[in-house]
Amino acid sequence: MNVYLPNGYADMKKIMSLPYPLIFVIGGRGTGKTYGACKELLALPENEKFFFLRRTQDEADAISYYDFSPFQPVIEDNPDEYKPIVVEKVPHVKNISGVWHGKLNDDGVMVADGDALGYIGALSTIHKIRGFNMQSVTIGVYDEFIPEKHVSAFRGGASGEGQALLNCIETIGRNRELKGKKPFKMECL
């Protein structure tokens, strides 16, 4: 199966439509994996939300600022296809940010409008909020899941990080299949 577009970028629409609950996408830097995934996440139906995961809380906090958000270039490159968005902390939930459609208020400031499109969090801190309900979250993207050599590993090394990822998937996915629902999907880029 060809998973590349004619322009050489990864065909994330095709990859993310595969029927597997856990997909690992490994490729060179700058091949459109994150960009393409963000396009697909912003195009989810209204009743479906996403969870965008980074390894550490520092990384999640950085991309929770619009100018550093991986969603920003998608919005700016495709203004006719996507509405403006707002990325900010979720009120009353520590360490989780949200992505909303944005609208200008009376003061000309872009503010969140309606329900969140999805959420941003960190693998290193998701265990602190276990037991929450995320039934509306249908897909997760774990961006930059392969650490660079100079990035310190989780306590417990790679096996600790692997266990944290499995716990994250279980926390968000719960028992959907037992209820006859589609499983939560996780795409690791």
Model regions: which residues?
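Phosphate/NTP-binding elements of NTP-utilizing enzymes
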Residues: 2-189
